Amino acid sequence: SEYRQKRTVGEEVTTDMRHVDESHFLTTTHEAYKPIDPSEYRQKRTVGEEVTTDMRHVDESHFLTTTHEAYKPIDPSEYRQKRTVGEEVTTDMRHVDESHFLTTTHEAYKPIDPSEYRQKRTVGEEVTTDMRHVDESHFLTTTHEAYKPIDPSEYRQKRTVGEEVTTNMRHVDESHFLTTTHEAYKPIDPSEYRQKRTVGEEVTTDMRHVDESHFLTTTHEAYKPIDPSEYRQKRTVGEEVTTDMRHVDESHFLTTTHEAYKPIDPSEYRQKRTVGEEVTTDMRHVDESH
């Protein structure tokens, strides 16, 4: 009876056929797709509007833009510049100047006077200053001294007072080029690898590494042979001896939560009936539209 729709008082029995309406499934909003009345498309006319308004779109420039004024025929007179009072009629010829289109800044491209390139001389400067650039090393660098011919004697190291002449042979040492730190690669004395013994240490310490588990890990204790007794669980006082067999239960490995996979009692699937529920409730699912 839950599936039966509630009828309002006075609703006819034929309500079961409400879904027969053809437009029912067109949309969830029944009104949205109902047949459209063509008269709805007709624009509402204001009082006094002439009947000839249907022809308003005949104007040729109507579709040029949504802004009617923007594309209306342009009056050529609009392009004529406004002249101020007293301006001469010959102002139309102002653009005849040849350098007008060279730049927007008229002065920038005016013919250049070559005399502008001549440097100003200070009072008393000699006339021969025009030849200052004849020096051969002038263009070697902007810093004249940087590229002047190098004196080979500059490469010779300065010797301190009393240094022997034989210092030129200092680089003959074989280990000189091994590193910039001469001491770092000098021949290593094997005796350096021998560990220093503390006073009283026995001579037999050289054999300390003979222990088999020495190289198993840097933590010697971590890999020492494991005592199987360590795996045995500690029993609390009073625990029965049969606790060793606790894992024999078949469902032990089903899950870490023992109760979750225990055998299910089929009676658990039976729904609880409320007091007074009829015995025929088992057939509630027979309804075809369930």
From Swiss-Prot:
Renumbered residue ranges of the record's region Disordered: 251-290
Sequence repeats: 1-38, 39-76, 77-114, 115-152, 153-190, 191-228, 229-266, 267-290
Top-level taxon of origin: Eukaryota
Keywords: Cytoplasm, Cytoskeleton, Microtubule, Repeat
Keyword Repeat: yes
GO cellular component terms, semicolon-separated: cytoplasm; microtubule
Protein location: Cytoplasm, Cytoskeleton
Skewed-composition ranges (Basic and acidic residues): 259-290
Keyword Cytoplasm among record annotations: yes
Free-text comment about domains: Made of tandem repeats of a 38 amino acid segment.
Protein name stated in the entry: Microtubule-associated protein P320
